[in-house]
Protein backbone atom coordinates (compact mmCIF):
# COMPACT_ATOMS: atom_id res chain seq x y z
CA UNK A 1 0.00 0.00 0.00
CA UNK A 2 2.83 2.42 0.87
CA UNK A 3 4.46 1.97 -2.54
CA UNK A 4 1.16 2.82 -4.26
CA UNK A 5 0.79 5.98 -2.17
CA UNK A 6 4.34 7.04 -3.04
CA UNK A 7 3.75 6.49 -6.76
CA UNK A 8 0.49 8.46 -6.66
CA UNK A 9 2.21 11.32 -4.81
CA UNK A 10 5.07 11.43 -7.32
CA UNK A 11 2.73 11.30 -10.31
CA UNK A 12 0.38 13.83 -8.72
CA UNK A 13 3.25 16.25 -8.13
CA UNK A 14 4.26 16.12 -11.78
CA UNK A 15 0.63 16.49 -12.82
CA UNK A 16 0.09 19.51 -10.58
CA UNK A 17 3.26 21.17 -11.86
CA UNK A 18 2.13 20.58 -15.44
CA UNK A 19 -1.24 22.13 -14.67
CA UNK A 20 0.31 25.21 -13.02
CA UNK A 21 2.69 25.65 -15.95
CA UNK A 22 -0.22 25.62 -18.40
CA UNK A 23 -2.15 28.17 -16.33
CA UNK A 24 0.88 30.47 -16.10
CA UNK A 25 1.21 30.43 -19.88
CA UNK A 26 -2.34 31.80 -20.35
CA UNK A 27 -2.76 35.59 -19.94
CA UNK A 28 -5.49 36.70 -17.49
CA UNK A 29 -8.64 38.40 -18.79
CA UNK A 30 -9.93 41.67 -17.36
CA UNK A 31 -13.59 40.57 -17.29
CA UNK A 32 -12.92 37.87 -14.72
CA UNK A 33 -13.40 34.96 -17.13
CA UNK A 34 -11.06 32.19 -15.82
CA UNK A 35 -9.46 31.41 -19.17
CA UNK A 36 -6.39 29.89 -17.52
CA UNK A 37 -8.47 27.24 -15.72
CA UNK A 38 -10.49 26.56 -18.87
CA UNK A 39 -7.36 25.98 -20.96
CA UNK A 40 -5.80 23.77 -18.27
CA UNK A 41 -8.95 21.64 -18.08
CA UNK A 42 -9.20 21.27 -21.86
CA UNK A 43 -5.55 20.23 -22.08
CA UNK A 44 -6.13 17.78 -19.21
CA UNK A 45 -9.10 16.25 -21.05
CA UNK A 46 -6.97 15.85 -24.18
CA UNK A 47 -4.23 14.12 -22.18
CA UNK A 48 -6.78 11.83 -20.48
CA UNK A 49 -8.14 10.78 -23.87
CA UNK A 50 -4.64 10.15 -25.20
CA UNK A 51 -3.54 8.08 -22.21
CA UNK A 52 -6.79 6.08 -22.29
CA UNK A 53 -6.28 5.16 -25.95
CA UNK A 54 -2.63 4.22 -25.41
CA UNK A 55 -3.49 2.05 -22.38
CA UNK A 56 -6.16 0.29 -24.41
CA UNK A 57 -3.54 -0.95 -26.86
CA UNK A 58 -0.96 -2.29 -24.47
CA UNK A 59 -0.95 -3.78 -21.02
CA UNK A 60 1.32 -1.86 -18.70
CA UNK A 61 2.55 -2.70 -15.24
CA UNK A 62 0.60 -1.68 -12.17
CA UNK A 63 3.26 0.92 -11.36
CA UNK A 64 2.89 2.61 -14.75
CA UNK A 65 -0.89 2.77 -14.35
CA UNK A 66 -0.54 4.14 -10.82
CA UNK A 67 2.02 6.88 -11.43
CA UNK A 68 0.66 8.08 -14.79
CA UNK A 69 -3.02 7.16 -14.74
CA UNK A 70 -3.93 7.82 -11.12
CA UNK A 71 -1.16 10.17 -10.07
CA UNK A 72 -0.18 12.41 -12.96
CA UNK A 73 -3.57 12.49 -14.69
CA UNK A 74 -5.25 13.09 -11.35
CA UNK A 75 -2.94 16.01 -10.66
CA UNK A 76 -3.26 17.66 -14.05
CA UNK A 77 -7.05 17.24 -14.24
CA UNK A 78 -8.03 18.73 -10.87
CA UNK A 79 -11.53 20.01 -11.61
CA UNK A 80 -12.15 21.29 -8.09
CA UNK A 81 -10.74 24.65 -9.18
CA UNK A 82 -13.25 24.63 -12.04
CA UNK A 83 -16.18 24.16 -9.66
CA UNK A 84 -14.86 26.71 -7.16
CA UNK A 85 -14.19 29.29 -9.86
CA UNK A 86 -17.69 28.87 -11.26
CA UNK A 87 -19.35 29.46 -7.88
CA UNK A 88 -17.21 32.49 -7.05
CA UNK A 89 -17.77 34.03 -10.46
CA UNK A 90 -21.54 33.42 -10.41
CA UNK A 91 -21.97 35.01 -6.98
CA UNK A 92 -20.31 38.30 -7.96
CA UNK A 93 -23.11 39.89 -10.01
CA UNK A 94 -25.83 39.22 -12.59
CA UNK A 95 -23.44 39.82 -15.47
CA UNK A 96 -20.84 37.65 -13.79
CA UNK A 97 -23.45 34.90 -13.41
CA UNK A 98 -23.95 34.93 -17.18
CA UNK A 99 -20.20 34.73 -17.67
CA UNK A 100 -20.08 31.80 -15.24
CA UNK A 101 -22.87 30.02 -17.13
CA UNK A 102 -20.98 30.50 -20.39
CA UNK A 103 -17.79 29.31 -18.70
CA UNK A 104 -19.43 26.08 -17.48
CA UNK A 105 -21.02 25.39 -20.87
CA UNK A 106 -17.84 26.03 -22.83
CA UNK A 107 -15.79 23.96 -20.37
CA UNK A 108 -18.04 20.90 -20.66
CA UNK A 109 -18.32 21.05 -24.46
CA UNK A 110 -14.64 21.83 -25.01
CA UNK A 111 -13.62 19.14 -22.52
CA UNK A 112 -15.72 16.51 -24.28
CA UNK A 113 -14.29 17.46 -27.68
CA UNK A 114 -10.78 17.42 -26.21
CA UNK A 115 -11.26 13.90 -24.83
CA UNK A 116 -12.41 12.64 -28.24
CA UNK A 117 -9.49 14.39 -29.95
CA UNK A 118 -7.08 12.93 -27.40
CA UNK A 119 -8.41 9.41 -27.97
CA UNK A 120 -8.03 9.81 -31.74
CA UNK A 121 -4.48 11.07 -31.25
CA UNK A 122 -3.70 8.22 -28.87
CA UNK A 123 -5.05 5.62 -31.29
CA UNK A 124 -2.96 7.02 -34.14
CA UNK A 125 0.10 7.10 -31.90
CA UNK A 126 -0.50 3.49 -30.83
CA UNK A 127 -0.79 2.43 -34.48
CA UNK A 128 2.59 4.00 -35.23
CA UNK A 129 4.26 2.58 -32.11
CA UNK A 130 3.03 -1.00 -32.58
CA UNK A 131 2.78 -1.34 -36.36
CA UNK A 132 6.37 -2.46 -36.86
CA UNK A 133 7.74 -4.12 -33.71
CA UNK A 134 11.53 -4.56 -33.69
CA UNK A 135 12.55 -7.88 -35.22
CA UNK A 136 15.01 -8.50 -32.38
CA UNK A 137 12.23 -8.46 -29.80
CA UNK A 138 10.23 -10.98 -31.82
CA UNK A 139 13.18 -13.33 -32.10
CA UNK A 140 14.81 -12.87 -28.71
CA UNK A 141 11.90 -12.39 -26.32
CA UNK A 142 8.66 -14.07 -25.46
CA UNK A 143 10.07 -17.47 -24.52
CA UNK A 144 10.25 -18.73 -20.95
CA UNK A 145 12.59 -21.71 -20.50
CA UNK A 146 13.11 -23.63 -17.27
CA UNK A 147 15.13 -26.73 -16.53
CA UNK A 148 13.11 -29.86 -15.83
CA UNK A 149 14.00 -32.54 -13.29
CA UNK A 150 12.26 -35.16 -15.40
CA UNK A 151 12.60 -36.81 -18.78
CA UNK A 152 11.01 -35.19 -21.82
CA UNK A 153 8.14 -37.69 -21.87
CA UNK A 154 7.49 -37.38 -18.13
CA UNK A 155 7.64 -33.59 -18.29
CA UNK A 156 4.96 -33.57 -20.99
CA UNK A 157 2.85 -35.98 -18.94
CA UNK A 158 3.12 -33.66 -15.95
CA UNK A 159 2.08 -30.69 -18.10
CA UNK A 160 -1.00 -32.61 -19.24
CA UNK A 161 -1.90 -33.78 -15.73
CA UNK A 162 -1.57 -30.34 -14.15
CA UNK A 163 -3.43 -28.59 -16.97
CA UNK A 164 -6.35 -31.02 -16.68
CA UNK A 165 -6.45 -30.68 -12.90
CA UNK A 166 -6.83 -26.91 -13.37
CA UNK A 167 -9.77 -27.32 -15.72
CA UNK A 168 -7.83 -26.74 -18.93
CA UNK A 169 -8.14 -28.72 -22.13
CA UNK A 170 -5.25 -30.69 -23.59
CA UNK A 171 -5.70 -30.48 -27.34
CA UNK A 172 -2.82 -32.43 -28.84
CA UNK A 173 0.74 -33.64 -28.50
CA UNK A 174 3.45 -33.76 -31.12
CA UNK A 175 6.47 -36.06 -30.75
CA UNK A 176 9.08 -34.34 -32.89
CA UNK A 177 11.64 -36.98 -32.02
CA UNK A 178 9.41 -39.73 -33.41
CA UNK A 179 8.79 -37.66 -36.53
CA UNK A 180 12.50 -37.23 -37.07
CA UNK A 181 13.04 -40.98 -36.69
CA UNK A 182 10.39 -41.71 -39.32
CA UNK A 183 12.18 -39.32 -41.65
CA UNK A 184 15.45 -41.14 -41.09
CA UNK A 185 16.96 -38.25 -39.15
CA UNK A 186 18.37 -37.91 -35.68
CA UNK A 187 16.88 -35.60 -33.04
CA UNK A 188 17.17 -35.70 -29.24
CA UNK A 189 13.86 -36.22 -27.41
CA UNK A 190 11.61 -33.26 -28.23
CA UNK A 191 7.87 -33.17 -27.57
CA UNK A 192 5.23 -30.45 -27.89
CA UNK A 193 1.94 -30.23 -26.03
CA UNK A 194 -0.87 -27.77 -26.72
CA UNK A 195 -3.26 -26.87 -23.90
CA UNK A 196 -5.43 -24.04 -22.67
CA UNK A 197 -8.74 -22.67 -21.48
CA UNK A 198 -11.17 -21.75 -24.30
CA UNK A 199 -12.89 -19.21 -22.04
CA UNK A 200 -9.72 -17.15 -21.75
CA UNK A 201 -8.60 -17.75 -25.31
CA UNK A 202 -11.93 -16.70 -26.78
CA UNK A 203 -11.84 -13.39 -24.90
CA UNK A 204 -8.41 -12.68 -26.39
CA UNK A 205 -9.54 -13.53 -29.91
CA UNK A 206 -12.62 -11.34 -29.51
CA UNK A 207 -10.14 -8.53 -28.90
CA UNK A 208 -7.65 -9.38 -31.67
CA UNK A 209 -8.29 -12.34 -33.95
CA UNK A 210 -4.62 -12.67 -34.87
CA UNK A 211 -3.71 -14.05 -31.44
CA UNK A 212 -5.39 -17.26 -32.58
CA UNK A 213 -2.10 -17.88 -34.37
CA UNK A 214 -0.45 -18.37 -30.96
CA UNK A 215 -3.31 -20.10 -29.16
CA UNK A 216 -3.78 -22.48 -27.43
CA UNK A 217 -0.65 -22.29 -25.29
CA UNK A 218 2.26 -24.43 -26.46
CA UNK A 219 4.85 -26.07 -24.23
CA UNK A 220 7.95 -27.74 -25.63
CA UNK A 221 10.01 -30.24 -23.63
CA UNK A 222 13.42 -30.92 -25.14
CA UNK A 223 16.74 -32.50 -24.29
CA UNK A 224 19.99 -30.68 -25.03
CA UNK A 225 23.34 -32.14 -26.05
CA UNK A 226 24.44 -32.70 -22.46
CA UNK A 227 21.31 -34.65 -21.53
CA UNK A 228 19.59 -31.87 -19.61
CA UNK A 229 15.84 -31.47 -20.15
CA UNK A 230 14.22 -28.08 -20.63
CA UNK A 231 10.64 -26.87 -20.80
CA UNK A 232 9.91 -23.83 -22.97
CA UNK A 233 6.60 -21.93 -23.20
CA UNK A 234 5.41 -18.69 -24.76
CA UNK A 235 5.00 -15.86 -22.25
CA UNK A 236 1.29 -14.84 -22.42
CA UNK A 237 2.18 -11.26 -21.43
CA UNK A 238 4.51 -11.06 -24.42
CA UNK A 239 1.79 -12.45 -26.68
CA UNK A 240 -0.49 -9.65 -25.47
CA UNK A 241 2.08 -7.09 -26.58
CA UNK A 242 2.81 -8.88 -29.84
CA UNK A 243 -0.85 -8.69 -30.85
CA UNK A 244 -1.49 -5.27 -29.23
CA UNK A 245 -4.30 -6.54 -27.03
CA UNK A 246 -6.43 -3.98 -25.23
CA UNK A 247 -7.61 -3.62 -21.66
CA UNK A 248 -10.58 -5.90 -22.35
CA UNK A 249 -8.06 -8.78 -22.42
CA UNK A 250 -6.33 -7.81 -19.18
CA UNK A 251 -8.13 -10.25 -16.87
CA UNK A 252 -7.81 -13.18 -19.31
CA UNK A 253 -4.10 -12.52 -19.90
CA UNK A 254 -3.39 -12.33 -16.17
CA UNK A 255 -5.24 -15.62 -15.65
CA UNK A 256 -3.25 -17.16 -18.50
CA UNK A 257 0.05 -15.91 -17.05
CA UNK A 258 -0.81 -17.42 -13.66
CA UNK A 259 -2.08 -20.69 -15.14
CA UNK A 260 0.86 -21.18 -17.48
CA UNK A 261 3.31 -20.38 -14.69
CA UNK A 262 1.66 -22.90 -12.36
CA UNK A 263 1.68 -25.64 -14.99
CA UNK A 264 5.30 -24.95 -15.93
CA UNK A 265 6.52 -24.92 -12.34
CA UNK A 266 4.77 -28.19 -11.55
CA UNK A 267 5.85 -29.97 -14.73
CA UNK A 268 9.51 -29.06 -14.36
CA UNK A 269 9.76 -29.40 -10.57
CA UNK A 270 9.57 -32.16 -8.00
From Swiss-Prot:
Subcellular location: Cell inner membrane
Cited CDD domains: DUF302
Membrane topology: Multi-pass membrane protein
Regulation: Na(+) is not transported, but it plays an essential structural role and its presence is essential for fluoride channel function.
Binding site for Na(+): 74, 77
Cellular component terms per the entry's GO annotation: plasma membrane
Gene3D superfamilies: TT1751-like domain (3.30.310.70)
GO molecular function: fluoride channel activity; metal ion binding
Catalytic activity, reaction form: fluoride(in) = fluoride(out)
InterPro entries: DUF302, FluC, TT1751-like_sf
GO biological process terms, semicolon-separated: cellular detoxification of fluoride
UniProt main location, coarse: membrane
Residue ranges of the TM segments: 4-24, 35-55, 67-87, 96-116
Keywords recorded for this protein, A-Z: Cell inner membrane, Cell membrane, Ion channel, Ion transport, Membrane, Metal-binding, Sodium, Transmembrane, Transmembrane helix, Transport
Coiled coil: none
Similarity remark: Belongs to the fluoride channel Fluc/FEX (TC 1.A.43) family.
Functional summary from the UniProt entry: Fluoride-specific ion channel. Important for reducing fluoride concentration in the cell, thus reducing its toxicity.
NCBIfam families per UniProt: PRK01636.1-2 (NF002454)
Protein's UniProt name: Fluoride-specific ion channel FluC 2
Source organism of this protein record: Brucella melitensis biotype 1 (strain ATCC 23456 / CCUG 17765 / NCTC 10094 / 16M)
Gene name for this UniProt entry: fluC2
Amino acid sequence: MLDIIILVVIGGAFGAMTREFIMLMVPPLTDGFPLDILVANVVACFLLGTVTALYARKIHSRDVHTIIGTGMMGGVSTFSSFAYGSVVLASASVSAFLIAAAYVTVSVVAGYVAVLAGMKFGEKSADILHRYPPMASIIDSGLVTVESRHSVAETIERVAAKAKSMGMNVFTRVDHGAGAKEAGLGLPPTELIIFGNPQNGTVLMQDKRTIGLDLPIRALAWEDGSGKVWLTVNDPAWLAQRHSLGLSSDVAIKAMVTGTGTVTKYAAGD
